[in-house]
Amino acid sequence: GVDKAFSGPKKALRQVFPNSELDNPSNWKGRTPKEKEDNARRKFQDALRSELNKAKQCLELEEAGETCFACGERRPKIAMETRRKDKMPLFEGIVNFYPGFSHGVRVCGLCSLAVRFLPLSTMLAGNQNRLWFLHSQHLGLAATVARRYGWEHFDRLITGNKALDFYGSWETAGEAGTVVYLFCELLNSFPDQLRAIYRSGLPSTAYVFSNDNRGGFVQAIHVPNELLAFLAKLQIESKNAFKDFWEGLLKVRGDLREDERKTRAGFVRSISNRMIAGENIVGMCLTSDPPNLQGGWLGHRLYLQEVRGMAPEKLAILERLGISIAASEDAKKLVTELVTAQYHQLYGLLLGYVRKGWLSHQEFYFLLPPNAHKVAGEIRDVLLAVVYEWQHCQQEGKEFPRSTFDKAEASPDETLRRIQEIGRRLTNNLPNLQRWTKELTSARYAERIRGVYLNAVRHGAVGFEDYVFLAPLQDQRAMWLLRDYLLAFLFDVGRVELPEDEYPEFGADEVREIETF
């Protein structure tokens, strides 16, 4: 009946087509509800018939009279329509709906007719009463969305004798969260049909909009192909891991208390925005009390590889290192150091792992390459993720999902090769290598580091060119980094042993420069 109709004054369809034939109160005239409904339906059918005829004229006539504002094609003048936001979302005029003052925008009959069916692919997004639809160049994906969240949703409402409205039963939060949740839900329901689509590389864009009379809103959310490929690969690798990642990062359960729901919704919004942007998410998924990795390590490892572009060799190194930390006798102390360390202390902590024999100098260089100044924070997050997941598996009696990637030795680049050459000369030529290394480790200022290198030159262990390479003028960042590479070589190959409390770190002045770079 009219009370449960999709269109009409104050009905759901008015959000898309305000004041259209079905939503204009003046068209709902009559003595009975049926007469009102018949009058509005007649107005709509007449408009639809007119647009269908003009759409046919676009295809049948060869005249190129005007350019359609929507599709950009040249169409016959007789097949054009004047449209404002009452029948074409987000179109604006001088005033809302008064023809005498607002001529609107010229569009062809094909576009006018096509937009009539937009509600069949439109859904509710977030909690701000905004709408959205998914645009994809893959017909199979677009058709699946329209069928599941359009036709089938409306059929269920009609069968249940409920008022028609757009689909919005998302157990998530935020607009980006709704978009990613949709892709997860589709993949979970139609894995065989959609895996190939997700990995096809065709772009998908979600358009979030509102068409309110007081002002329109539109936002394009571009879904990265890498994110879709990651979801498809994760679902193939493990359905359980896919579900853990989906529910652990995107789901907001309905049984949460109000304060819990608010906190969870904020987390989901932040995570989904980062996923859409292809940013680091593992750090946000770590909880320390109790230690836990939301989403599971298998999903995060694949996300790091597919979306973040982290090399599988690097992930294998970090996984092995994280397990070494978690399984050590000093695990609690080492984890606390990782959690509480300032950014400038992370290089020193990783050098400590080289001294323990858990990392080689090549691996240290591979994890912290030159010109990757912000990677240390993500390295710390990944290590903690491995530690927390390993501890969780031990408590639950489960097997840790280790990487199957075989260890591969990469050939050193010019910088690492130069460090190795200098390190060998120091190892062979310095009379007291351990003392010299201790001085280099404890140096807190650039001048002191240069002084330690000059001592090596004085003893003939290295030459002037080596000194210039290790301590470049006006580039203190490079000097600190090269110092760490050299120490890693000496700890690894030179087997220099220092007391456990001797940790290299940046000096106070240099810290400020590096952190604000």
Regions from the language model: what does each represent?
Residues 514-515:
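Short, intrinsically disordered, charge-balanced linker/junction segments flanking boundaries
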Residues 1-4:
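Long, acidic/serine-threonine-rich intrinsically disordered regions with weak helical/coil propensity
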Residues 6-167:
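Basic, glycine-/proline-tolerant helical and adjacent loop/strand elements
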